[in-house]
From Swiss-Prot:
Its cofactor is [4Fe-4S] cluster. Keywords: 4Fe-4S, DNA replication, DNA-binding, Iron, Iron-sulfur, Metal-binding, Primosome. Heterodimer of a small subunit and a large subunit. [4Fe-4S] cluster binds at C315, C398, C415, C457. This is Probable DNA primase large subunit. One of its GO terms (biological process) is DNA replication, synthesis of primer. One of its GO terms (molecular function) is metal ion binding. One of its GO terms (cellular component) is alpha DNA polymerase:primase complex. It holds the Pfam family DNA_primase_lrg. DNA primase is the polymerase that synthesizes small RNA primers for the Okazaki fragments made during discontinuous DNA replication. Binds 1 [4Fe-4S] cluster.
Length: 513
């Protein structure tokens, strides 16, 4: 009989290994070079960086993305956005061209590379974060692509190995008339720049399946033949941006599926959680009562007066009037309105008094059992340590109101400019806010149809405060920066209150820019 070898591994137990360690046991570490200013972020970085770099680089990129999102909310044009973002990019996320011969090229591109992937980890967890991250990263990529040197841009696009086929000179000669007609349909105006663009189009055409460029087909900006779309140079940048966006969407989904299996460093988890929670626009970061006006009298007894003086935006005016009519609001309506009142400076004691007086069809016992705790929780008076330390919840921004928890039957929360039909919206504006000017109402209708809900709200604000705005501009009380598009209900209140009380509170009106 043969003796068994006691040192031999039991075959049944041979593969019982930690799958996480096995998964990453043979990671391929390699140095990354950055031949191009732009990046499709196809390859994750593998070199070591410090925990301080990890956090600071992510925060710097987050500043850029948040400000880009704010520009889109204010409906700035691409040129206005580029002008606004240039000093911020130079400060937080500079990217010099190869022709600049800067000694900082590698460091700049490494920071850009790493910061993208750090935020990708932070924002892959939910569909909403993935969608927002893709949108603002695409905005950043488009802006950089448009600003890139022509030769460097062409070299970068060629390096991507996109599934394009360059149209040969022979084929261009064969289709010269059709391609010329397509180019002229795009609309060239006289001028040196337009002539250069026309000549460039004549030199560089590519063809792809028409299914990849349905927007260009719809706009008749390409020539179609045998299932292929012939795309001129001026439209190829749009195709690159579209490819960047679609790839990033797919990669974020893969990242989301991998998150539960990642053996993350315990030091990184709280950083990633903090980054995702703070992915908000600078104008939307109202924490606690930071939007409150110190000298304003905000109490339960004068909320009706503030509403009647048109200091509340349409969303909050509708919630208030619904509350007064029904003596009740459903959960999301109570939450949205409570946080707004908290943000304008209504303290917890007064807020509890306001809700108790408003819910006048129920007993004290019912109110204390069903509603009192929730109000205290939003103020950070009860709940876990983190809730109390953080002062409870922050007031909702326009973006949050527009994108989260759309109202259902019997609910009054949300944004009237988005969630109301036009008839109900006009009734609210006319009867609830005193907007009767036909031109303003028609403008609101056009804004709503174009889904420019922020513009509709600001149009109403400017109409209701036109005299005060003129005085503030004429006397230099507020700068242009302080009068930019409102993207937060609490900013609406603050600006309205200060404008209506300019003569009484000059100190408060001089807001920080």
């Amino acid at each position: 009989m043969l003796r068994s070898n006691v040192s031999r591994i039991d075959p049944k137990r041979r593969n019982v290994l930690d799958h996480r360690k096995k998964q990453f046991a043979e990671a391929a570490y390699k140095d990354t070079d950055y031949p191009h200013r732009l990046n499709f972020y196809s390859t994750p970085p593998t070199a070591d960086i410090t925990i301080e770099q990890f956090e600071q680089w992510a925060i710097d990129r987050l500043r850029i993305l948040a400000e880009l999102e704010a520009c889109s909310f204010r409906n700035k044009t691409p040129a206005e956005t580029a002008s606004h973002m240039k000093p911020l990019l130079d400060k937080y996320l500079p990217l010099d061209t190869n022709s600049s011969s800067s000694s900082q090229l590698f460091a700049q591109r490494q920071k850009d590379h790493y910061s993208h992937f750090i935020l990708r980890l932070a924002f892959a967890s939910t569909e909403d974060l993935r969608r927002r991250f893709t949108r603002v990263e695409t905005m950043l990529f488009r802006m950089r692509l448009n600003a890139d040197d022509g030769r460097e841009r062409a070299a970068f696009i060629n390096s991507l190995n996109l599934d394009w086929e360059t149209v040969s000179d022979e084929e261009k000669r064969e289709l010269a008339a059709e391609l010329a007609a397509t180019a002229s349909f795009g609309g060239y105006k006289k001028g040196q720049q337009q002539q250069q663009q026309y000549e460039e189009d004549q030199q560089t055409w590519c063809k792809v399946s028409w299914l990849r460029v349905p927007e260009l087909v719809e706009q008749r900006r390409v020539f179609l033949r045998q299932g292929y779309a012939y795309v001129p140079a001026r439209e190829q940048q749009a195709m690159v941006v579209s490819e960047f966006s679609s790839r990033l969407e797919r990669q974020l989904e893969l990242t989301a599926r991998a998150l539960p299996r990642l053996d993350e460093d315990d030091r990184l988890t709280p950083i990633l959680a903090h980054l995702s929670k703070n992915f908000i626009t600078p104008d939307a970061s109202y924490v606690g009562t930071s939007s409150a006006i110190s000298s304003a009298d905000i109490s339960a007894r004068n909320i009706d007066t503030l509403v009647n003086n048109h200091h509340f935006p349409a969303c909050m005016s509708h919630l208030h009037r619904t509350l007064r009519r029904d003596a009740h609001l459903k959960h999301y309506g109570r939450l949205q309105y409570t946080l707004f009142l908290k943000g304008i400076g209504l303290n917890l004691e007064e807020c509890l008094l306001f809700w108790r007086q408003s819910f006048n069809k129920i007993t004290d016992d019912t109110f204390n059992k069903e509603y009192r705790y929730n109000v205290r929780h939003t103020y950070g008076d009860v709940g876990g340590d983190s809730n109390r330390r953080g002062g409870g919840y922050s007031p909702y921004s326009c973006q949050k109101i527009l994108t989260e928890h759309p109202p259902g039957p019997g609910e009054a929360h949300g944004c009237p400019y988005r969630h109301f039909n036009m008839e109900n919206l006009q009734t609210l504006l006319q009867q609830g806010m005193g907007v009767t000017d036909r031109g303003v109402l028609n403008g609101v209708k056009e804004d709503k149809e174009k889904q420019k809900f922020h513009m509709a709200c600001n149009r109403v604000f400017e109409h209701l405060h036109k005299e005060e705005l003129k005085k503030a501009k004429d006397e230099g009380i507020m700068t242009a920066a302080q009068l930019e598009t409102i993207v937060h209900p609490n900013e609406y209140f603050k600006r309205s209150y200060l404008l209506k009380n300019m003569g009484k509170m000059q100190g408060d009106v001089k807001m920080e820019g």
